[in-house]
């Protein structure tokens, strides 16, 4: 099986779900993080069992982002996750998960639940969806989120140790053609 895990419906009916987890992936997890990572992946996949999907029309990045938002709020995010604003808001997984966390913080408890519930019975139409929930286009929300992210610190100019400076001065002096006879 490629990837980490996936959730699928059952042939019985849509109320029965199956979670498939890659044994190769489990075996590759650092033993110090294995329990937490397995729990995190299972939480993510369990969300897929209960979340709505806009009658099959919601972007995959939003679906995965909701699942990673729940994982994040459960305290099970892996150490390599980063808040970043590169690309589109619906790039998915932690990228969208952190965006949804910002929405929850900015618009109040239950905001992500409102997003999920709005996907229950009607098709996802981006132009309408976010404005109905938050009164703004998703691009405007994404831009606000981007503005709220900490700005990267500018790189400080590396200061050369005094010994390196002295060595460079000596070499320059030795190589100076005017001193050669």
Model regions and ranges:
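Pan-zinc metallopeptidase signature
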Residues: 90-97, 103-181
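Short, charge-rich binding segments
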Residues: 10-13, 30-32, 41-42
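Active-site recognition of the HExxH zinc-binding catalytic motif
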Residues: 40-53, 64-68
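Post-HExxH zinc-binding segment in Zn-dependent metallohydrolases
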Residues: 54-98
